[in-house]
Amino acid sequence: MTESERTSHLDILYENQRGIMLCGVPYFSEKSLLNFDPAPWVDQHFVASPVSTKTATCPDPSWEWAWQRWYIDMSGDVDESGWQYGFSFTMNNWHGKPVSLHSFVRRRRWIRKRKKKELRRDELPLVPESFTISSSYPIQRSSTQTRSSFEDDSSDFDLSEVTTIPALLRALQDSRIDREKLEALATFLASASIDEKVYVKNCKKDLLKNFVFEHSCRKANELLNASLTAAEASTSQVALRESPTPQD
């Protein structure tokens, strides 16, 4: 287990529903699940979970939530609400577009990051300022090295990997300064689909809470608005070009 895995963890819950498509409209509910279906909520190993996103808590007091709430994983082949559809839960053939007579069940993935609580100074274990291997050679603790471990401003993520919504959320949480958060947001928006941009904009209020300074929040808001406006304009132009030309 890496140091990152010991100090942070991404909790995963799957939400399951059964239903049917009528005239292109999905009618699904967890109350429609059959006896042989999985539970309404299952964990990352698809084992029935006694909790949902509304009731889940950290496993013990040494953990706390790094993210303020649960997020729908919008990566992969999903619809605008994060659902994947299939013929049955036992078949591993999930798709983001519901198809009549082939979409009787659906699921979506929820994620939330938690982290180990940081000990306050008065909770740190007592360690002597020096210790001795032999009576002749005292070994002094390096205060410079200790400070550097707390003052390191480098982040643990690679900007090139910020191409999905979960990766963006992780980057915003892990970044220590607003400049890095803005770079992560700009990188994501450069490759995001219009649906992803709409989703992020709808979560804008929670997203902006990750920024420390007001001017950074304004800059992030400008990036979101400009990116979505450009994407919508591009989509409109494509639609106009593809529309049939009236014949004389």
Curated annotation (Swiss-Prot):
Source domain of life: Eukaryota
Secreted found in the keyword field: no
Any GO BP annotation: macroautophagy
Xref: SMART domains: DysFC
Keywords in alphabetical order: Meiosis
Cellular component aspect of the GO annotation: peroxisomal membrane; prospore membrane
Record-linked InterPro entries: Peroxin/Ferlin, TECPR1-like_DysF, Tectonin_beta-propeller
Function: Has a role in meiosis.
Protein name as catalogued: Meiotically up-regulated gene 65 protein
Gene designation per UniProt: mug65
